[in-house]
Swiss-Prot record:
SUPFAM superfamilies: Bacterial photosystem II reaction centre, L and M subunits. Pheophytin a binds at Q128, N141. HAMAP family: PSII_PsbD_D2 (MF_01383). A plastoquinone binds at H213, F260. This is Photosystem II D2 protein. It is a multi-pass membrane protein. It catalyses: 2 a plastoquinone + 4 hnu + 2 H2O = 2 a plastoquinol + O2. The chain crosses the membrane at residues 39-59, 123-139, 151-164, 206-226, 277-293. Its EC number is 1.10.3.9.
Length: 351
């Protein structure tokens, strides 16, 4: 008589780590968490440190921290000095040579926040891929999140890479972002760029679709309970629909003459519109990085220059852009020591 014993296969360290990372817990970690959590922690921590303590006097000639008297709307982690070019500004690099205070003064925190922030966003998208696979659903959440990632990377990384230095990227702050928007308008005529137009249409169109969808569902909820409001009548385990798609279709058919009759197509459209808006605006920013022009109506500018009585909204905007450049550049780029004589400052028919 012979007996045999089956030994359990030995599990390597990778399998043990894989099980631990994917364990069911309140906050899922996963393999993506190894990228997401450290980089997000460092990016947010760097931003809080910069807005609290670090001045922008040496890079922009500005006060930008709570310590100097700025508030939540005016504080920022400012871009590095123009002289730094596209240096990664590593703490141990030749610019700072391990001196933390000097590193902060040169704008090293901005490079730190931008780099770790980009990897944190990528980690968050990978997190959505990972959880989608584990739960057994399609990865459209992650695909949609590529929109914000495209905007962040194009605005904060690709645009300044196309310009002379990181200095021309947006600083991380509310008022600082507004300054960057004015800069894009004055130097690139951004609002007339077709990719900006598509971006606006996508974002506002997505908001409109979301509002229409929300009110339509609320309007067509089944009266299926005796409670004071319809929310309490909902049961997460109910098998039947909670609203009437047929009634919604009938309503919008009467309003517009057309309506969605397919829920899957409807929700894909709600996904597609805002994400395409983010993607197209990102493409436009890449164009600005290369200083590409869009919609220069030179014939109107020439006629306006020759005829004092001829002016269009376009020519008026061109004059406003000239004003932005002329009055903004000396303050925005103090290191250039710009001095514009009075006779070159823009004057239009209405200015």
């Amino acid at each position: 008589m012979t007996t045999s014993t089956l030994q359990a296969p030995t599990r390597g360290w990778f399998d043990v780590l894989d099980d631990w990372l994917k364990r069911d817990r309140f906050v899922f970690v996963g393999w993506s968490g190894l990228l997401l959590f450290p980089t997000a922690y460092l990016a947010i921590g760097g931003w809080l440190t910069g807005t609290t303590f670090v001045t922008s006097w040496y890079t922009h000639g500005l006060a930008s921290s709570y310590l100097e008297g700025a508030n939540f709307l005016t504080a920022a982690v400012s871009t590095p000095a123009d002289a730094m070019g596209h240096s990664l500004l590593l703490l141990w690099g030749p610019e700072s040579q391990g001196d933390f205070i000097r590193w902060c003064q040169l704008g090293g925190l901005w490079a730190f926040v931008a780099l770790h922030g980009a990897f944190a966003l990528i980690g968050f998208m990978l997190r959505q891929f990972e959880i989608s696979r584990l739960v057994g659903i399609r990865p459209y959440n992650a695909i949609a999140f590529s929109g914000p990632i495209a905007v962040f990377v194009s605005v904060f990384l690709i645009y300044p890479l196309g310009q002379s230095s990181w200095f021309f990227a947006p600083s991380f702050g509310v008022a600082a972002i507004f300054r960057f928007l004015l800069f894009l308008q004055g130097f690139h005529n951004w609002t007339l760029n077709p990719f900006h137009m598509m971006g606006v249409a996508g974002i506002l169109g997505g908001a409109l679709l979301s509002a229409i969808h929300g009110v339509t569902v609320e309007n067509t909820l089944y009266e299926d309970g005796e409670q004071a409001n319809t929310f309490k009548a909902f049961d997460t385990t109910q098998e039947e629909e909670t609203y009437s798609m047929v009634t919604a279709n009938r309503f919008w058919s009467q309003i517009f003459g057309i309506a969605f009759s397919n829920k899957r197509w409807l929700h894909f459209f709600m996904l597609f519109v805002p994400v395409m808006g983010l993607w197209t605006s990102s493409i436009g920013i890449i164009g600005l990085a290369l200083n590409l022009r869009a919609y220069d109506f030179v014939s109107q500018e020439v006629r306006a220059a020759e005829d004092p009585e001829f002016e269009t909204f376009y020519t008026k905007n061109i004059l406003l852009n000239e004003g932005l450049r002329a009055w903004m550049a000396p303050v925005d780029q103090p290191h250039e020591n710009f001095v514009f004589p009075e006779e070159v400052l823009p004057r239009g028919n209405a200015l």
